[in-house]
Each structure stands twice: as structure tokens, then as C-alpha cells.
Amino acid sequence: MARSDYLFTSESVSEGHPDKVCDRISDTVVDAYLAEMPEARLGVETLATTNRIVIAGEVRGPDSVTFQRLEELTRAAIRDIGYEQDGFHWKHADVAIYLHAQSADIAQGVDASGNKDEGAGDQGIMFGYATDETPALMPAPIYYAHKILKDLADARKARIGDAAKLGPDAKSQVTVRYEGGRPVEATQIVLSTQHLDPSLDSAGVRAIVEPYIRAALPKSWVNDRTVWHVNPTGKFVIGGPDGDCGLTGRKIIVDTYGGAAPHGGGAFSGKDPTKVDRSAAYAARYLAKNVVAAGLSRRATIQLAYAIGVSRPLSIYVDLHGTGEVDEGRLEKVLGEILDLSPRGIRTHLGLNKPIYARTSAYGHFGREPDADGGFSWEKTDLVAKLKSALA
């Protein structure tokens, strides 16, 4: 029997976290190629350390995207994040780029030819999840962990009051108490943030960040019982890639559901949408969110599975966690009918062959508002009517 009273914790990291810097750069490269050639293929990895960035991977795209242009875009991304420190500076860091052509063996399995539809770029399993415990249909712990850091980053960049003393690198963690299966309060709040003023101690940093944290959380969630851990080590001046080496694809739980749902293991950033690690995970979230938005369940987990070179998913699995109003087996069949879940079908329906990925690289790929230019299209709830009709 499912528990209804418990504690659950999720963490987030800011755009200035070393791994997120790398995700941002990798997705900036993806966007640069897709802007020039929507059918470009990319698998791009980034490493960042003290004043050094290494970009490597496989690309099939136009020669108009030069390494010089990619270096300029990389520096612009680092500048936007806010790094102007001796150990990591957008202007002075060394940028090395090692991109080469995509393997012909991989391409032949993915490319459409004759009567063969475009195949998946790799094998794998992908999960999507939705829950009605927040307006964004996301789990509360990860949703609010993201919101805390996004609000602090916005204040830092706008140089609002003492928030200007904060640095780009930060982490948050929120423990939420559930009662009757619903989130009711934050029992523990952890916030570690880089600060540019070396004289600041934990109390000084808390004085800056606490108002933003309280504003980010539901009003009744922070009370006299809430335990705070703000910069527990006391000092956090050296941060970002100068403090810890960063790599693309190391924050896959932060990117998704904060541990509240399964993860297939594949990272998103640096990959074009023929890679089902990315596109099918977006499709699974899209389906799960529409199921919950349609009132068919309070929670939904959806798994998709693919094989390299094969266009159709090998399996579709639905778990409504005992909250469903419909038969899960029937819903599995309907989901495969109302949305073409081939790589091409997903890309076409969600409009994924666009330069919309750099913005996904921090504060979560899910639970965001759809953008007018097609960004976060997988967060739309435009399948609700189709779902209800198909299940009527």
C-alpha cells in the first residue's frame, strides 16, 4: 500500500554550477547548428575547469558554423551566466574545440531511405512523469528547489540590493513533508551559494537569500519548525569550474523530476532531437502531463523504449499509481494512437528541430512555461481533448 505521510527531498543547481555551465555550452552548440540547418545531427560534450573549456563530439551540419563562431557563442554564454573571476572568466578562458563528423555507421541506421522511416539514434528507455501537486504538474520538491535558484539568479543578474554580492554557482535542496499524499510544508531548506564578498559568513548570506526563499515557497510552508542550512561550510568564494571540474550530462535527476520518478539514464544536453534520450523523454513528459491535465489521474508515469535504427517504440508502459480513472492497458494503446511516437513523429509534433535548447540547460527541462517560439512545447496540454475523446 502506498504511503501517504512521508518526507521527500530534491535538489537543484544553478546555471553557474560547473556541470550546468557545460550543459549550457553543449546546448548552445546544438542551437547554433539547428539555427543554420534544422536537420543537423549533434552529440556534443563539454568539460570546464579553471579558465579552460573543452568542447568535443560528433556533428553533421553546415560549414557556415565555424569553430570561431562557436567560441564566440561559448564566451557569450559564460558571460551571461556571470563568470568574470580570475579563475574562470568569459574573456580569458581558453576554449578548445574538437568536433568531427558523425559516424557513418550510426547515420545509416538513423537516416530515412526508400520505404524505411527515420530510426531512433540509439537504444534506450525514457520516462515521463506528472503529478497534480503543483500548478506545473511537477513534484513539489524539485519544482520549488528550481524556483529558489531561478529567483536568486534573476535578482543577482539584475543587481537587486545585496543579491549583487552573490556569485553564479549555487545549489538548493528542499525537504517536503507530505500529509495524506499532499505536500504541506518544507521541513528542511539547504542553500549553498557562491558569494563575491569574502567577508560574508553564513548568517550574512542567509540575510540575503532568506527573503527570496520565503517568497518562492507557498506561504504556509516555512514556519518555526523549518530547519535552515545556508552555506553550512561558512565560506563559498571559489566556485564554478574554478572550484570543481564540470562535465555535460551529470545532472540528469536535477534536469527531470528530482528523484520522484524513474530515469532511463540518458542525459539531454548536447543532443539533437533524433536522439531519443532527449526527444522521447520530452514526449513521455508531454503525454504524462496531458493525462493528468485531462483529469484521468492525479499521477502518471510513462515509459517508452527504443532500438537504434528502429522507428517505432518497442514498448509503451503506463503507471497511474492507483490514482487513475481509466484502465492503464487501454491508455497505453490510446497514447500510441493519438501521438506518432517515432523519432520523426515526435520531432514534427513538438517542433523540436529549432534552436530552443540552451534555455533548457538550467532550472529543469520540465515544469516550464511553453514559449511563443516553440520552446518547451512538450509542456503544452493540447492533447487533453483528444485523450478524453479517445477514451470516451
From Swiss-Prot:
GO annotation, biological process: one-carbon metabolic process; S-adenosylmethionine biosynthetic process
Region span, Flexible loop: 102-112
Superkingdom of the organism of origin: Bacteria
One GO CC term, this protein: cytoplasm
Catalytic activity field: L-methionine + ATP + H2O = S-adenosyl-L-methionine + phosphate + diphosphate
Pathway where this protein functions: Amino-acid biosynthesis; S-adenosyl-L-methionine biosynthesis; S-adenosyl-L-methionine from L-methionine: step 1/1
EC number of the protein: 2.5.1.6
Co-factor note (free text): Binds 2 divalent ions per subunit.
Keyword ATP-binding applies: yes
UniProt entry keywords in alphabetical sequence: ATP-binding, Cytoplasm, Magnesium, Metal-binding, Nucleotide-binding, One-carbon metabolism, Potassium, Transferase
Cofactor(s), by name: Mg(2+); K(+)
One matching Pfam family: S-AdoMet_synt_M
Transmembrane segments annotated in the record for this chain: none
Presence of keyword Lipid metabolism: no
Residues engaged in binding ATP: H17, D169, A170, K171, K235, F236, D244, R250, K251, A267, K271
Class of the enzyme per the UniProt entry, highest EC level: transferase
PROSITE patterns, alphabetized: ADOMET_SYNTHASE_1, ADOMET_SYNTHASE_2
Residues annotated to bind Mg(2+): D19
Signal peptide annotation: none
PANTHER family xref list: S-ADENOSYLMETHIONINE SYNTHETASE (PTHR11964)
Protein's recorded name: S-adenosylmethionine synthase
Organism: Methylobacterium nodulans (strain LMG 21967 / CNCM I-2342 / ORS 2060)
Origin organism lineage: Bacteria, Pseudomonadati, Pseudomonadota, Alphaproteobacteria, Hyphomicrobiales
Gene designation: metK
